[in-house]
Amino acid sequence: MIAKLQGFPENVIAFAGRGQVTKDDYVSTLIPAVERAFASYDRLRFYYELGGDFAGIDVDAMAEDFKIGMQHLTRWERFAVVTDVKWIAHAISLFSFVMPGAIKVFSTKDADQARSWIVSPSL
């Protein structure tokens, strides 16, 4: 499942992946929130937390993630991904060259640092 996280500025979309993340989670929760935010802001930041209760993500959910990312490719300002899942960290580093915004992966023990970074002013 995907849960929307509170306590972030309006230009930061923040979610946590818990348990098994599915395509339905993206279609019913994440994508509508992203579209609503882009209706109000030209550029957004994205914070995604995949902690100890994250069990995995199905292939269809990954496809939805890729589609929403590419649909708004030039409008993403910054990404923070918090995870200790090595394959996710590696996948992000492989695809980071495609993304125009800054991308950082943080370990779960550094979640506070990730939250500070995602809201910090751009240089």
Segments the model singles out, each with a brief description of its role:
Residues 1-123:
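Amphipathic, Lys/Arg-enriched alpha-helical "gate/interface" segment within cytosolic domains
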